Amino acid sequence: MKLPAAIDEVGDYLADVTALEAAGAAALWIDDGSLDPWVLLGAMAAVTHRIRLGCLLESGLWPPATLATLQKLSRGRTMVAVSDPGATSHRIFIAGPDQDAATGAIFEVQSADQLGAEAARDAHIEVWAAIEVPPDRAAWAEARTAYETAGATGVILPWNERVLDLLRNPEPDDRTDLLISTG
């Protein structure tokens, strides 16, 4: 999930972060926008326990001491994605013990077919696909399956309140198990 770096109400923002973690999101990403991404990721680390936290850097620079502190606060859940000027992808760096360290890339694609050979199935290579929010549950299930089959580690969706519902209720709307009989 790619969250906006702008915050209107901090309580609502952090509530969305915890709700996304509870709904099963694998990672939350923010841009290095107007707010300090490191402080924002530190706040997110304080209210979460499992979800990975990533920053999409356009500048290509990150302070090593700040990243080390954030890794400590997040218990090793921090990822950094760096964009090369003019590139259509971000390179990902995931710090941690040697067995957990990884690199990878984020690709902005229109379909899973575009990942092709980029989606290497090496345990230390992560491939994230930045996609649009699917229109419904069926499209969400289809997209997840297609990108997983293509070798993607996961998909990154822009923040949309509908995504929380997709994460919480990934199955189609057919809930015949909930029908009640009245006489």
Per-region residue spans from a language model:
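N-terminal glycine-rich cofactor-binding segment that shapes the pocket for flavin-like pterin cofactors
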Residues: M1-A146, A150-G154, P158-G183
